[in-house]
Structures are given as structure tokens and as C-alpha cells.
Amino acid sequence: MTEGSWERARRILAAAGLPPDRLARCRPLDGGTYNTVEELLLTDGTRHVLKVPPPRTAPGMRHERELLVSEAEFYRSAATVDVPSPRVVATGDRHLLMTACPGQSWNGTLTPDEQSALRAELGGLVARLHQVTGPGFGYPSGALGPLAPDWRTAFTTMYDAVLDDARRYRAWLPRPVDEVARTARAAYDALEEVTTPRLVHFDLWPGNILVDRPEGTPRIGGLIDGERMFWGDPLADFVSLALLGDIEDDTAFLSGYRKAGGRADFDPAARRRLALYRSYLYLIMLIETVPRAVGDDDAAWTRKVVAPQLVAALDDIGRHGAGRSKG
């Protein structure tokens, strides 16, 4: 912890109406790849989490501007349907202060029965998230402009922005950028089936799912890191929920999701949309290695593991039938 971090934390606590003298510890948290994340422990044992974005001049992808605006929107929305997540304490131009959720990131110490029960519980929570509707489609941060009146307009804007980032950073991709654009465009008509903007977290990999054991039995303690959220097609959440895999293989999750009222139909049009969303996430994972300036080993791992998934998603777009794209 630096002296600057300590003083910044005290200043933000004071602005939030919390006595800064109650700050007992300020320590960095692992896992953040864009924002600085710190845990603030108060003298009464209360834990808060503080997020601070990088300088505005730092390299990044277009959709990453004002991520904390989107994150606060996610937590406020999740609270309306009683999904465990951080509570927003205070927001500012350059910070987000929130409560800390109990538990540790989902890991490999769970038994198969515990895994199955938690996946079913997670399915129910995600179904509740998808009940929340928004005022329009897209990123509420305004990073790519105002919310759009329809999903096709919003998602094609999101996709084009990522491809523009690939060109701008000269990022390596397993297929040429223009070919990726043409392939995706062939499935854009399937987006027109989505008519209601729903809450999508879009980053629900195990690292962002906290597991708590309040009475010995594991329960989900919180869904965190909602900074990638957008208003759109709930089907898009299935990508990170089955990162580098296939959500249709996760029978426990789908059972819990459907039992809680979630709709999970995998007809050809849905599979085309899902392939689009998979390609979108895997493009981001490949492209962001450039502005993040990750090391050679991390870049090589991403190419080895993620690039084949991007190719498979693009192939699936064609496999599930090309639509009557209008561009």
C-alpha cells in the first residue's frame, strides 16, 4: 500500500460520510485487470471495496470508458431482485466505493455435489438478474454513445467498436478483421428477435462468483465485478458462465435457471446469437492483451487457448445458418 492509496481511501471515506479515522487497513486486491481495486478494513470490522480507474490517458478499449458507471448500475439493479452483490456506498468522478461480499472466489476445492448445488443456485440468481429491464440497449456508461432503441443497433455498435480496437492496436487475430466482420454480419438479423433490454453481467466466470460457508454448506456470497454489464439479450450471459465451454453441458445451472423462470431455448436463431456473443467476448480477450501490455507468456496463452474458441464461434455462426443481413 502506498501513502497515496491511504490518503485517497481516507478522502473517499470522508466524502461518503464515513469517519476516515476508522480506516484500519488498505490493501490491494488481486484479479483486476483494468481498475485498481483495494479492500478497506474499518476499525469495527466492516469491509469495503474501493475501485479507481486508470488515468484517462491510459490505453484501453473503447467500451472500457467509464466502466464504474456500468458497475454501479449493475449493483443497484441486482439489489432490486435480491441477488447478492456489493451495495453501492458512494460514487464519484473517479471512484466507486461499495460494500464487500462474504466468501472467496469459486475454486476447485468444492466436491462434485457442492458444485452441482451451487451451479443450480447460480442459475436461479442469474434468472432473477434477467428479470430486470432497462431503459434501452447497450452500455449505460455512454462509452459508445447513448442507449439504443433496439438490440441490433446496440450490439452491432459494440461489435464494430471492438473490431475498430483490433485495427487501432494492430492486435493479432486468427482471422483477418474484415473477414470477422463479414462473418458476424451474416447473423445480425437474429438480433432482431430480442425486443426487451435485460440486465446482463457478461463476466460471470468463477473468479467473479464468491462462495461463502456461513453454516458449513457452501452458498453463493455475491456476484462481483459488474463493470462489463450492459442492457441486452440475457442469452449473452451464458458465454462467460461457460467460459471456453458450452452452456448446454451445464445441466445443473440450466435446471436452476429454468426453475426460477429463466428462458433457455437453443433453437437455430438462439445458437446464432450465442455464437455472436461468444465471438464478441473472445475478440475482447485477444485484443485487450495489447493495451494491457501483458507479458509474452500471457499473450501466448491467450492465443493458444482463446483463438481456437473464436474460430469455433465464427464457424458456428455459419453452421447455424446465415441470415438476411442488412449490414
Where are the language model's segments positioned?
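ATP-binding pocket architecture of kinase catalytic cores
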Residues: 26-156, 160-161, 168-171
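Flexible, glycine- and charge-enriched loops at secondary-structure boundaries
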Residues: 2, 61-68, 111-119, 243, ...
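Short, surface-exposed alpha-helical segments at coil->helix boundaries
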Residues: 6-10, 69-72, 251-254
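Helix-rich C-terminal or lid/interface subdomains of diverse kinases
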Residues: 29, 34, 121, 160-161, ...
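An alpha-helical support segment within catalytic cores of ATP-dependent transferases
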Residues: 4-21, 102, 112, 116-120, ...
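Short strand-connecting beta-turns/loops that link adjacent beta-strands
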Residues: 43-45, 93, 214-217, 279-282
